Amino acid sequence: MERKRFIDCDSTKILQELALNPLDLTAPGVLSAERIKKFSLLGGGFTFSFATERLDDAILAALISLAEERGLHESMLAMQQGQVVNYIEGFPSEMRPALHTATRAWVTDSSFTGEAEDIAVRSRVEAQRLKDFLTKVRSQFTTIVQIGIGGSELGPKALYRALRAYCPTDKHVHFISNIDPDNGAEVLDTIDCAKALVVVVSKSGTTIETAVNEAFFADYFAKKGLSFKDHFIAVTCEGSPMDDTGKYLEVFHLWESIGGRFSSTSMVGGVVLGFAYGFEVFLQLLQGASAMDQIALQPNARENLPMLSALISIWNRNFLGYPTEAVIPYSSGLEFFPAHLQQCCMESNGKSIVQDGRRVGFSTSPVIWGEPGTNGQHSFFQCLHQGTDIIPVEFIGFEKSQKGEDISFQGTTSSQKLFANMIAQAIALACGSENTNPNKNFDGNRPSSVLVSSQLNPYSLGELLSYYENKIVFQGFCWGINSFDQEGVSLGKALANRVLELLEGADASNFPEAASLLTLFNIKFR
């Protein structure tokens, strides 16, 4: 059945009308116990409160109707079953499924067929290979260095950091992404190369930043008299230039249908997490992620946490007109998580055409950013409360700390103070505070949602990762865009190569704009 475009949906028109007079969160009694209970949802181990969003029953009903008109449930089911979702009609495009969910489907009773089943089976095989590899070599190394960029660094780095306080380990972990040689040199200054394992991650096997950093490390190891094959392993697609067991100590695989920003539950994240914390920790992460994938298949948005959250974000973006969204985790372990979400959301949904090749005619991805609380309260929260731009916030919190070490100070523990601050911020943003002194007046009506679980551990981290991945995909399905390619990245790479040609002696007339900029900055290129 052919569906109406997002901009043409009946529900879109209703929501546009409702947006003219959204719920006033500052009105007396709005945040009642009844509303707080009603505007909440349980999803796996998480409780989601959206009582502090500017929506009511009518708006929520229209958003759910929008999900039905746009076929969000059917689209998610099609994606998880392996149908082609990465495409642009009538134009050359990747024409692939997006099967990151299959990389963890094998840990549950998920039953799929075709390519989804194939990727799930292959993922199980790779996981067993990883388990065997770690059993054999993990004790020989004290350090792992992961070389990769984009999804080969941001997701794995965020997950590793998130579990550092929960999972004791004697292993040291470093990530190298930037082509800036100082990035690699700083790490090499701190490690014992003889006890270091280097995992080189590139889906294509040709990523220039990764190749340069690999060469940088290989040269350093060689000067130390260390064999490349004894210390370097690869994670890449089957058949890529890096798929060479004659060169590497071991090669682990992912597949073309696994997008980089969605690849953390493949070997892209598995190798480093398994080395750092043990294979069982990685397995628990997969179990949590797969459980949330099942929730994402619920047809009713009121029972589907990532779908409902996606709809609320669309309400804020497309109908209330807010161009940015902050993700504020009240957990030090999640300090790198907003950066991962920034890539996952903005690279997926920062698109200006729908899948039939036409211009969208509406706003797509908001700018995603964030830092942990309470630190953020002492830096940018001033802007959230009294700035001229309204910035929706998604708070993430946990009932107890990871390590369980705490102190009672002035009648409450540190964990209680952390949680109290998060709740207070959501209420303050929503309700504001009137004051005759204009400098102390807070208008309120600044929307937020709050996502809470009992503790940040491998399983809940997997749930959280999957929640955001599925939320982002649901947004793309609703807008009708392709969330699984990244042509903007490709353009930048192509132009960078042309600049490099100038530095190698090419005629300046081949790229006069770049030549002029190089001249301005006194960069010699002839």
Swiss-Prot record:
Active site: 347, 378, 493
Keyword Isomerase attributed: yes
A Pfam family assignment: PGI
Enzyme Commission identifier(s): 5.3.1.9
A GO term for molecular function: monosaccharide binding
EC class (word): isomerase
Gene Ontology CC: one annotated term: cytosol
Chief location: cytoplasm
Signal sequence annotation: none
Pathway it works in: Carbohydrate biosynthesis; gluconeogenesis; Carbohydrate degradation; glycolysis; D-glyceraldehyde 3-phosphate and glycerone phosphate from D-glucose: step 2/4
Catalytic activity: alpha-D-glucose 6-phosphate = beta-D-fructose 6-phosphate
Compartments in which it is found: Cytoplasm
Protein keywords: Cytoplasm, Gluconeogenesis, Glycolysis, Isomerase
InterPro entries listed in its UniProt record: G6P_Isomerase, G6P_Isomerase_C, Phosphoglucose_isomerase_CS, SIS_dom_sf, SIS_PGI_1, SIS_PGI_2
GO process terms (BP): gluconeogenesis; glucose 6-phosphate metabolic process; glycolytic process
Family: Belongs to the GPI family.
Function field: Catalyzes the reversible isomerization of glucose-6-phosphate to fructose-6-phosphate.
The protein's name: Glucose-6-phosphate isomerase
Top-level taxonomy: Bacteria, Pseudomonadati, Chlamydiota, Chlamydiia, Chlamydiales
